[in-house]
């Protein structure tokens, strides 16, 4: 989304959004700035639908997710909240601390993401967690020496490349200090009344007194499932003592289906969106909006630059709002859109917008390009021939959104160019 598109879309959305125009704090007025508040009104039905449709398009979603019985206190959502907080720390260094950057409180018993996972996160655009779908936990049977797990990867976004995948299972403390070998297998083929064909994926050594989350690398298996969904027959776990004897996973402290909600086993996968797919999505979105509003833009080009608050403030106050191009407050609330049931965080974010005059002479703080300076000068000499430059974003930052999909899986996605960091004349 280029700067001109952002400039044009914000005024349209501004009158529809449930927003507040205010100064950074109620007791602070910025130099040469005049902010006004107005009585907020409830969105009409068609306004809400238009806003929801547009934001869903920006978020890359074809429809509003309707998760079945989403639960934020389970292990997978808690882990994803921890990753979300890690991303927010980086975003807070890139922009002013705002409402959208509030960290999410976590269950104290839940371990933090490892350095390796933070490394995966730094190179990923999307992170998805998957809950275990196996209902009958084999560990409930006294003589069972294996656990089975199944994960549904059918909702992977088109065009996303899986860069890393992990299987995580919690181990409680047990009162012995024996050493065990935990092995994860990919189920290749099931057989009636026989053991399935298995392929060893990863293994690690544990001690009885060890406590915490065990992580296994299943990247190759995850890629195989994404490319060949019909081969997704799940994982199988087994435990052996050092003398090669099978051991019930429950006896070494491994938590299964009947364990606490915040210690349930799950899978997490990291994805990178290909540049080709990203350009295709942007092209389709921009084409739709250009067709819908080409006529409106043409009419607007023939009008003098209008302040974003025209129609909101009375004429007597509007004359004070004629100011130089700069950044203004704009807050988008997901809660006001009725999305609090599927968006975990943030509840909203400060998007900001650019507005103001790009009139001759352009001051240094207007972040004007050389082209804009020349265009302003020509407009000053001959206003009928060349229009004024536009006030538009010169720097945009991203945000991260944590949400449930239709299957109640938790997704953490990074979205670029969502927050105006600086404005200038272009």
From Swiss-Prot:
Species name: Xenopus laevis (African clawed frog)
Protein name as annotated: Bone morphogenetic protein 7
Annotated disulfide bonds: 325-391, 354-423, 358-425
InterPro entries, per the entry: Cystine-knot_cytokine (IPR029034), TGF-b_C (IPR001839), TGF-b_propeptide (IPR001111), TGF-beta-rel (IPR015615), TGFb_CS (IPR017948)
Molecular function, one GO term: growth factor activity
Functional note: Growth factor of the TGF-beta superfamily that plays important role in various biological processes, including embryogenesis, hematopoiesis, neurogenesis and skeletal morphogenesis. Initiates the canonical BMP signaling cascade by associating with type I receptor ACVR1 and type II receptor ACVR2A. Once all three components are bound together in a complex at the cell surface, ACVR2A phosphorylates and activates ACVR1. In turn, ACVR1 propagates signal by phosphorylating SMAD1/5/8 that travel to the nucleus and act as activators and repressors of transcription of target genes.
UniProt subcellular location: Secreted
Entry keyword annotation includes Cell division: no
Entry's Gene Ontology cellular component terms: extracellular space
Keywords of the record: Chondrogenesis, Cytokine, Developmental protein, Differentiation, Disulfide bond, Glycoprotein, Growth factor, Osteogenesis, Secreted, Signal
Gene it is expressed from: bmp7
């Amino acid at each position: 989304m280029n700067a001109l598109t952002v400039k044009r879309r914000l005024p349209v959305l501004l009158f529809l959004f449930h927003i507040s125009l205010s100064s950074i704090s109620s007791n602070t007025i910025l130099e040469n700035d005049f902010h006004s508040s107005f009585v907020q009104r409830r969105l009409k039905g068609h306004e809400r639908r238009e806003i929801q449709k547009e934001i869903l398009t920006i978020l890359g979603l074809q429809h509003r997710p309707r998760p079945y019985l989403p639960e934020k206190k389970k292990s997978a959502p808690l882990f994803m909240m921890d990753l979300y907080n890690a991303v927010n720390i980086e975003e807070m260094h890139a922009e002013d601390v705002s409402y959208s950057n509030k960290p999410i409180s976590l269950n104290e018993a839940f371990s933090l993401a490892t350095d390796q996972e933070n490394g995966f996160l730094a190179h990923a655009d999307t992170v998805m967690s998957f809950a275990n779908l196996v209902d009958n936990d084999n560990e409930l049977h006294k003589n069972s020496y294996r656990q089975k797990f199944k994960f549904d990867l059918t909702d992977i976004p088109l065009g996303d490349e899986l860069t890393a995948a992990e299987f995580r299972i919690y181990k409680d403390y047990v009162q012995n200090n024996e050493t065990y070998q935990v092995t994860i297998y990919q189920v290749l083929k099931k057989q009636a009344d026989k053991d399935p064909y298995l392929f060893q994926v990863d293994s690690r050594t544990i001690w009885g007194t060890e406590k915490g989350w065990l992580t296994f690398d299943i990247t190759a298996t995850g890629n195989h499932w994404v490319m060949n969904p019909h081969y997704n027959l799940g994982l199988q776990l087994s435990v052996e003592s050092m003398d090669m004897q099978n051991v019930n996973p429950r006896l070494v402290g491994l938590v299964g289906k009947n364990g606490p909600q915040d210690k349930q086993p799950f899978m997490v996968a990291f994805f990178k969106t290909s540049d080709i797919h990203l350009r295709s999505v942007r092209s389709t979105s921009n084409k739709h909006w250009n067709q819908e509003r080409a006529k409106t833009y043409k009419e607007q080009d023939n009008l003098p630059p209008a302040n974003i608050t025209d129609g909101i403030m009375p004429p007597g106050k509007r004359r004070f709002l004629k100011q130089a191009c700069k950044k203004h407050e704009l807050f988008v609330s997901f809660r006001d859109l009725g999305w609090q049931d599927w968006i975990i965080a943030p509840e909203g974010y400060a998007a900001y917008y650019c507005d103001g005059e790009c009139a001759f002479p352009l001051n240094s703080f207007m972040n004007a390009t050389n082209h804009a300076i020349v265009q302003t000068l020509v407009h000053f000499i001959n206003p009928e021939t060349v229009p004024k430059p536009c006030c538009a974003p010169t720097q945009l930052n991203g945000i991260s959104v944590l949400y449930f999909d239709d299957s109640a899986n938790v997704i953490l996605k990074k979205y670029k160019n969502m927050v105006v960091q600086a404005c200038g004349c272009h």
